[in-house]
């Protein structure tokens, strides 16, 4: 936590700071923007404000991460994680996504979503 406070001070002085972490709650206290990665692919870019409520997040994995935070109940993300070296087609989260359709297996373009971007057809 002290390291994150130091990063925040650096950012307040105008320095660019990139934080890579699995501790989403801690990151949300420190950063302005979040890029969500899954299986080596960026799937959503959002402001910290978008992480205030689940419904402002667009990608199902981002929403699952939101629900998995301790303050939201530690909800388990079901399914099997892909092997990152596999040649994944389409959305890498599709095999674990309750809302996935056949379209999710194709190319997924970036689209504007709120204050960020998302790679999801939903």
PLM regions: where:
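P-loop NTP-binding/switch modules centered on Walker-like glycine-rich loops
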Residues: 1-74
